[in-house]
Regions:
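Intrinsic-disorder/low-complexity signal
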Residues: 1-215
Length: 215
């Protein structure tokens, strides 16, 4: 397993043993905001509605299609969105995805060269208020995403998102969207490059307009 940081890469087409992979999952995970209380007691929980999306682009970095909770399947049926999570983890990290993007690599239509992964705040909650966020890339023996605490996926990579307030490109302060990274074709295989660029973009459309600058 690879612990990704900005600029890190992982092969999506083969596992650590060189076995060919046909289906991989991108699981986004985040926590609800704890508020109030004293010394860890009392207080409440504020639901956090983040949205995971993917943007498919051609070799010229032009958008072909976006898959998100309102359009769950790509036109070639290679990419599927699990659905909208409106809350986040309310009792700490439960080891499961809040939203999952499944990708069948061999079914992606040939004109797609890049698949960018995005996470943005639907309710415009700032990232520096959210206790944790992360992405993991994995496979499963049954071809299904992780929806049970006792699941044992084969994790290819983890990307724990950390606030670096000293880096204007990745700081969480005042930001509500992040370009997690992108998958790309290379020598007949699919690779993934982690980015972690944050912004104050308030919609998927705004992010789509700036995406080519990061790829």
């Amino acid at each position: 397993m690879i612990n990704l940081s900005k600029g890190g890469r992982v092969n999506l087409s083969k596992d650590d043993n060189g076995n060919k992979l046909s289906k991989v999952f991108f699981g986004a995970n985040w926590g609800a905001i704890k508020s109030g209380g004293f010394l860890g007691f009392g207080g409440g929980t504020e639901a956090v509605d983040l949205d995971a999306s993917v943007v498919l682009m051609d070799a010229n970095k032009r958008k072909l299609e976006t898959v998100y909770f309102g359009h769950k399947d790509s036109s070639d049926r290679a990419i599927h969105h699990s659905g909208d999570d409106l809350v986040g983890d309310t009792n700490g990290d439960d080891g499961m995805d809040n939203e999952t993007i499944s990708v069948e690599l061999d079914r992606i239509r040939p004109e797609v060269e890049y698949v960018a992964f995005i996470l943005n705040s639907y309710r415009h909650q700032r990232f520096d208020k959210i206790p944790y966020m992360g992405l993991r890339i994995y496979t499963t023996t049954d071809g299904r995403p992780v929806t049970r605490p006792n699941s044992n996926p084969n994790v290819l990579a983890k990307y724990n998102l950390d606030n670096d307030s000293n880096d204007p490109d990745t700081t969480f302060v005042g930001r509500e969207a992040i370009i997690l990274g992108y998958a790309y074709r290379k020598d007949g295989e699919w690779k993934f490059k982690a980015l972690g660029n944050t912004g104050s973009w308030q919609s998927i459309g705004e992010i789509e307009r700036v995406l080519p600058n990061f790829i």
